[in-house]
């Protein structure tokens, strides 16, 4: 699938898959919601559930489709559901208590734990090794209001900081042969003042298949330590609100 087809698939989830509000006493209302695996009825086991692994896979799909905001909201909703409000504090079970047929089942369940780890590394932090092509793609999926984040794995660490109009990414590799870091980031303002790699002016490219926001690609040489700095200027970019289509009784767009 291309990026727009991936976007369309996630829009199907938005409009056709049941969303269940995640609420609790003392939890600030912020649109948190988990999802069912399907809208299939009548109920049968393993066809229509509220299962943590499937929810996390869907969150990863949002990140992969370039919809990091929706991916993060679903990720956080599921973490609140399982780790804080469910019967597996600080961990994941198999099924959410929002599942009407089964409710909470099992504790410390390996399947959602593994998928949640993948969402964190490949989705939220966007670490995508591509050693066959001697590169490692970093496609951060941080919420817009984050001004710092960091992650450390056995093979790579990186730290993101934002100060006013400047975004900085410090990348440290521990591969036997360092890969070329390729940073993919959404344009957050109307103009780029400068891009630097290890303090030296660098070029950037626009990825044509992007949607929602312009997507920039910045490539660096494969070294054990890399610092990429992006300085923005002019006004912030904003996306248009999604307007749901109106379907007439004959099945055509009104």
Range-by-range predicted roles:
Residues 57-254:
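Non-catalytic C-terminal accessory modules of carbohydrate-active enzymes
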């Amino acid at each position: 699938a291309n990026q727009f087809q991936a976007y369309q698939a996630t829009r199907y989830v938005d409009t056709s898959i049941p969303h269940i509000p995640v609420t609790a006493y003392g939890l600030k209302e912020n649109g948190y919601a988990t999802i069912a695996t399907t809208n299939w009825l009548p109920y049968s086991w393993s066809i229509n559930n509220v299962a943590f692994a499937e929810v996390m896979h869907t969150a990863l799909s949002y990140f992969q489709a370039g919809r990091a905001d929706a991916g993060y909201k679903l990720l956080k909703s599921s973490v609140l559901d399982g780790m804080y409000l469910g019967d597996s504090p600080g961990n994941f079970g198999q099924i959410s208590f929002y599942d009407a047929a089964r409710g909470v089942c099992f504790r410390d369940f390996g399947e959602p734990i593994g998928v949640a780890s993948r969402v964190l590394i490949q989705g939220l932090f966007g670490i995508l090794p591509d050693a066959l092509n001697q590169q490692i793609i970093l496609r951060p999926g941080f919420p817009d209001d984050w001004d710092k984040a960091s992650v450390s794995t056995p093979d790579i660490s990186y730290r993101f900081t934002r100060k006013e109009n400047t975004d900085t990414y410090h990348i440290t590799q521990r591969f036997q042969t360092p890969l070329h870091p390729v940073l993919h980031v959404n344009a957050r303002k109307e103009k780029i003042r400068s891009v630097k790699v290890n303090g030296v002016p660098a070029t950037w490219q626009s990825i044509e298949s992007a949607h929602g926001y312009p997507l920039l690609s910045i490539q660096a040489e494969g070294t054990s330590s890399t610092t990429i700095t992006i300085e923005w200027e002019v006004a912030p970019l904003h996306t248009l609100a999604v307007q749901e289509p109106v379907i007439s009784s004959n099945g055509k767009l009104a």
